Amino acid sequence: INAIIEGNSILPFFKQITGENFAVTGGQLGKIDDIFYLVGGQRFDGRYNPMGNPTYTQTYSDQIKKFRISNQGSQLSYSDFSTIVDPIHLRRRDYNLLPQIFTDGTKGYTISSGVFQPDSDLPFLYPVDITSEGYTPITTFNQYLSNYHSAKSCLYDSINNRMHTLFFGGMSLY
């Protein structure tokens, strides 16, 4: 902040690293303890074309990518890279990743809806919970609104031990 206020360069405060493992659009990044979670998304190469002409290729990751980031010295690095693959429940992009405190006190995330189902241009209607132990599809719940990425606020009620999520819009199927 002081660099901005004083009109100095902010470049010394930024670091970056590149890697094919992270070439994802439409996914979300979360962190549980010291592990980062890159959830869902797709690899998109080419020019976007809403008419479906062959100007691009896209490949859904169908994954939760887990890794650690080391910020030592002047270079970033990552380690302990692993993946969880599920082409059914983790085929999500352009969704909301919601930070959660589950009823047992475990911290994690919930994938809220997202697009597109493998055999149709429809959103997923059920969420997927993620913890450090793995993931759980909640197929008994249907989310009919806010299927696409949007602004949101996740609120924890410590008295009643409940999470609440407020979506500020978001495209919907219904």
Q: What residues fall within each predicted segment?
A:
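Beta-propeller and closely related beta-sheet repeat lectin domains
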Residues: 25-29, 93-98, 148-156
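Short, conserved, GDST-rich strand-edge loop motifs in beta-rich repeat architectures
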Residues: 1, 39-59, 113-125, 168-174
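Loop/turn-rich, solvent-exposed surfaces of beta-rich toroidal or solenoidal domains
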Residues: 111-113, 146-174
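Short coil/turn segments that connect the beta-strands within blades of beta-propeller domains
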Residues: 33-34, 106-107, 162-163
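Short loop/turn motifs that recur once per blade in beta-propeller domains
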Residues: 11-24, 84-92, 117, 134-147
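Asp-box/WD-like beta-propeller blade repeats and closely related beta-sheet repeat scaffolds
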Residues: 1-33, 44
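Beta-propeller blade signature
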Residues: 1-5, 50-73, 122-136
